[in-house]
């Protein structure tokens, strides 16, 4: 009898499906974004977009019957990309391989080569440079490339009669890239950059730089400092500057912090959130959708769709499927080009009475 019981126990242990290598009952989505520094508003919006997408996917049964769950790591990347690598490794130690993020260019540059060599898929909802996704076939950019919008604004400035421009772009990599793009396109058209200022990304006093820039008597100013644009607007106003101001990206929170000093500022950006996403977000969080919320939502839906349609969960298989997805998302129709960058329409915006309003479709 004892021999029989031992035999039965042996059979049960080794015949039980997935006994020691059970398929996880949930699929973990890791989020890498800033939630405790100057980019916390964008980071919070990103996390909330992911939460709404996870709720939607789980509400319709999950992926192959498995529910999605969320893990968030704070990248604190407003001034440095180094923390993003630490956050990434923390998620990887917990075997998370489906990742949304990081938030900005510095982290993207630091993280892309590491992720490209790893068994993960990374989709950023807020990075606006092409260098990120070009690092590997498993890296995706659902935001688009901001350079196109910046170059468009340079053409619009020249068309409006600007021939002399002052450029202020911080040393944060994304800010710097936009300043370079604007200056390059403006000079290509025949304009002259009469002043170029490059403050530190965490600077708060811009008066000396602004006085120096205004002394060159520019026809207009191009401002690229995502985390301090509101401060710059206030200081320009105190100096009596009333001329035109162009930028490439303004966040509603930054505009609000500027206390009206950014009124009249024009910029080009991708189309914002639309449809039922706006009402659902407002009903859930009692605030308007912020930068990154809609694209984070779309990133999760794109990943869930790719997972659902893939024959297995190998990174190569899912990456290939993800590159072909197409659906109507919160930020518009989601499709990727051959470099795994979302194809998105650029629109022109203006700040009026402390609020961002759509001006007209861009080219």
Question: Model-predicted segments: where are they?
Answer:
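Extracytosolic ligand-binding ectodomains
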Residues: 4-10, 16-363
